[in-house]
UniProtKB/Swiss-Prot annotation:
The gene is obg. Residues 345-424 form the OCT domain. Residues 159-331 form the OBG-type G domain. This is GTPase Obg. The lineage of its organism: Bacteria, Bacillati, Bacillota, Clostridia, Eubacteriales. It comes from Clostridium acetobutylicum (strain ATCC 824 / DSM 792 / JCM 1419 / IAM 19013 / LMG 5710 / NBRC 13948 / NRRL B-527 / VKM B-1787 / 2291 / W). GO terms for molecular function: GTP binding; GTPase activity; magnesium ion binding.
Length: 424
């Protein structure tokens, strides 16, 4: 089964908690604190597997969580870091953040990998909180929670050449004779309902990947037929082979077919319309008058399309010349990565921890990323830890800012769900 879209939940490992521990040994009366730090949480990393061609695996498993960091221990023993979780994806996978619908990464090469969520930082053990005036801290820092998010995976096939054209014009037959691919072939519309890939070996010249793209009909850019479900697979191709039924066996005019398909490409993505095209006038074995082909070629020449081949995929007439021309044209087109527009690019959350203060009645509310991080790293119910919490607020300038705003003794200060009474 070919699956080219998936949505999964990823969560990195939480950091391990720092340890509260004191050295207790015979004949050592002043052992002091010796709590070790917690380990780092494991990352979740997407990595390209060249052997994968579909996102089918994600149809059955949608939740991926990496390992938590181990807690610190006494004797200054650090916790073990959590193991990173590697998720294999096919080459050509685009990763989007579901919440913003922005593109986070485009994994288009064999060795590409991307850290989708980073593990939480391990908490510090109580030995790290020793000062000349606080020689036996009775608190440690909890580990930071790991990141989590829903992401969507979107596969855009990596092919050098894309076969486009109306249904039943012979695209699948052409792919089957040009490569070892074995797509379903029958004499009815939409025989092909998923893209098919084949490696074409042009003897003595080169080899390239060809894709049979189904579902392009009039209105496809607006969702008609199979719609734009498969139009996106053309985006990575460097060259398009536009297959038309020159025999008009279904009562359609080949020139009109050609113009309609190009109009759909233009509506979907203007860059596709500008992509180099070779025209394959297929089913020529059913045409007994060369004037029909010559007239078609003349009209295309007027429109600027010079590469027009008369072929029959069924009898293989003209197919070899067509493939040689594909190889020649490809050699003149550089391989480039897909550009991600600035407005579609995911912007990571600002790692600079900031805060704002506002007043509601007699309560001063402090909020922001600085507050979230601070509360996650202390235990406000433990006296030593609360004093450390108060010191951080003062060193950060929060207390001074509150005083400038006119706070008085007895007023309440709220940080998220935690409140305390202000005293100078």
């Amino acid at each position: 089964m070919f699956v080219d879209k998936a949505r999964i939940f990823v969560k990195s490992g939480d950091g391990g908690d720092g340890a509260v521990s004191f050295r207790r040994e015979k004949y050592i009366p002043l052992g002091g604190p010796d709590g070790g730090d917690g380990g780092e949480g494991g990352d979740v990393i997407l990595v390209v597997d060249p052997n994968m061609t579909t996102l089918l695996d994600f149809k059955y498993k949608r939740k991926y969580v990496s390992e938590r960091g181990q807690n610190g221990q006494g004797a200054k023993c650090y916790g073990r870091d959590g193991k990173d979780l590697y998720i294999k994806v096919p080459m050509g996978t685009i990763i989007r953040d579901v919440e913003t619908d922005k593109i986070m990464a485009d994994l288009a090469h064999k060795d590409d990998k991307f850290v989708i969520v980073k593990g939480g930082r391990g908490g510090k053990g109580n030995v790290k909180f020793c000062t000349p005036t606080r020689q036996a801290p009775n608190f440690a820092q909890p580990g930071m929670p790991g990141e989590e998010r829903w992401i969507s995976l979107e596969l855009k096939l990596l092919a050098d050449v894309g076969l486009i054209g109306f249904p039943n014009v012979g695209k699948s037959t052409l792919l089957s004779v040009a490569s070892k691919a074995r797509p379903k072939i029958a004499n009815y519309h939409f025989t092909t309902i998923t893209p098919n890939l084949g490696v074409v070996d042009v003897s003595g010249i080169s080899s390239f990947v060809m894709a049979d793209i189904p579902g392009i009909i009039e209105g496809a850019s607006e969702g008609v037929g199979l719609g734009f479900e498969f139009l996106r697979h053309i985006e990575r191709t460097r060259l398009l082979v536009h297959v038309v039924d020159i025999s008009g066996s279904e009562g359609r005019d080949p020139l009109e077919d050609f113009l309609k398909i190009n109009e759909e490409l233009k509506k979907y993505n203007i860059k596709l319309w500008d992509r180099p095209q070779i025209v394959a006038a297929n089913k020529a074995d059913m045409v007994y008058d060369d004037d029909q082909f010559n007239k078609f070629r003349e009209e295309l020449n007027k429109l600027g399309y010079k590469n027009v081949f008369k072929i029959s995929a069924a009898t293989r007439m003209g197919v070899e010349d067509l493939l040689k021309e594909c190889a020649r044209v490809l050699s003149t087109i550089p391989v480039t990565d897909m550009e991600i527009p600035e407005e579609e690019r995911f912007v990571p959350e600002d790692k600079h921890f900031t805060y704002t203060i506002r007043k509601e009645g007699d309560t001063y509310i402090v909020e922001g990323t600085f507050v979230d991080r601070l509360l996650a790293s202390v235990n406000v119910n433990e006296p030593d830890s609360f004093r450390y919490f108060h010191k951080v607020l003062r060193n950060k300038g929060v207390m001074a800012e509150l005083e400038e705003m006119g706070i008085k003794d007895g007023d309440m200060v709220r940080l998220n769900d935690f409140e305390f009474e202000f005293l100078k």
